Amino acid sequence: MQQITLSKPVSCYGIGVHSGKRTQLTIEPAKENTGIIFIRTDISSENNYIEAKYFNVSDTLLSTTISNSNKIQVSTIEHIMAALWGCGIDNAVIKIDGPEVPIMDGSSKPFVFMIECAGKKLQNAPKKYLKILKEVTATHKDCELTCTPSDHMKIDLTIDFNSKAIGRQNLVFSKQESFNNNIADARTFGFTKDGDYLQSKGLALGVSFENTIAIDDQDKVLNPDGLRYQDEFVRHKLLDLFGDLYTSGNNIVSSINGYKTSHALNNELLQRIFSDNTSHKFVTASEI
């Protein structure tokens, strides 16, 4: 199994769901072993690039933000990271002229479409996998995320909200190739009761029915077109998990169980994995 990049650059425009700012984003091909790198083209500093790695995650409030040593940052990276993972892209440079990845329709599907339009290119280096060797767990209150050794990827995710519109939902997923058709178009969601508070804090300034599932005080979905799936909420949480875990830099080979996960918990699991050298190793496909 070889590493993969894009065949050519591909671009989009959109607004940030939290900043409300309009940005242009371009995904470009990158050399073998580059990984995923973001470059802030609106900043002239030589240090305007940020590796999309777990150790660069600087904020996990409502989304995942990465920063470099100059405190230059890019926020809400999880949806495009999930798309890159789902499409099997190992190496890419993402150029963006603002602080936040466009929210598009609130899912990963537009980014998947962009990558499919650009095409994929096989590279002359083997794809590397992160194989888990022993159980690692991250917890916060009643929330938990655990990875255990396995010869293939399998995720069992449960969410539980005190909302009749969502409630308790469970999803088991094990085929990366089915991500684009079954998970990628699941949208982000939020509660109208939180809107004023979030906007007073400079968040959710770009929210609309076009990019967010809105749930009102009566636990009703307000979007005119309703849901794309009955369990769209857990599908989106799984999407977020894939995007966050891809900041490991590799596909993870493990059985993963999650309960009420969050961006913070997803990153904490990676921090725990990489803080223990005996918990993992990097392998090629033939070594899995």
Curated annotation (Swiss-Prot):
- Organism expressing this protein natively: Rickettsia bellii (strain OSU 85-389)
Instruction: List cellular component terms (GO).
Output: membrane
The cross-references to InterPro entries, in alphabetical order and at most eight, read:
Ribosomal_Su5_D2-typ_SF, UDP-acyl_GlcNac_deAcase, UDP-acyl_GlcNac_deAcase_C, UDP-acyl_N-AcGlcN_deAcase_N
NCBIfam families reported for this sequence: lpxC (TIGR00325)
Q: What Gene Ontology molecular function terms does this protein carry?
A: metal ion binding; UDP-3-O-acyl-N-acetylglucosamine deacetylase activity
HAMAP family, alphabetized = LpxC
The record lists the catalysed reaction(s) as: a UDP-3-O-[(3R)-3-hydroxyacyl]-N-acetyl-alpha-D-glucosamine + H2O = a UDP-3-O-[(3R)-3-hydroxyacyl]-alpha-D-glucosamine + acetate
The record's EC number reads 3.5.1.108
Residues of the active site: 263 (proton donor)
Q: Which GO terms describe its biological process?
A: lipid A biosynthetic process
Keyword annotations of the record: Hydrolase, Lipid A biosynthesis, Lipid biosynthesis, Lipid metabolism, Metal-binding, Zinc
The job of this chain, per UniProt, is described as: Catalyzes the hydrolysis of UDP-3-O-myristoyl-N-acetylglucosamine to form UDP-3-O-myristoylglucosamine and acetate, the committed step in lipid A biosynthesis.
- The residues that cross the membrane are none
Pathway(s) where this gene product acts: Glycolipid biosynthesis; lipid IV(A) biosynthesis; lipid IV(A) from (3R)-3-hydroxytetradecanoyl-[acyl-carrier-protein] and UDP-N-acetyl-alpha-D-glucosamine: step 2/6
- Alphabetical list of Pfam families matching this protein: LpxC
Family membership, please give it. Belongs to the LpxC family.
Q: Under what name is this protein listed?
A: UDP-3-O-acyl-N-acetylglucosamine deacetylase
Which cofactors are required for activity? Answer: Zn(2+)
Which residues does Zn(2+) bind? Answer: 79, 236, 240
- Asked whether the UniProt record includes Disulfide bond among its keywords, one would answer no
Keyword Hydrolase on this protein? yes
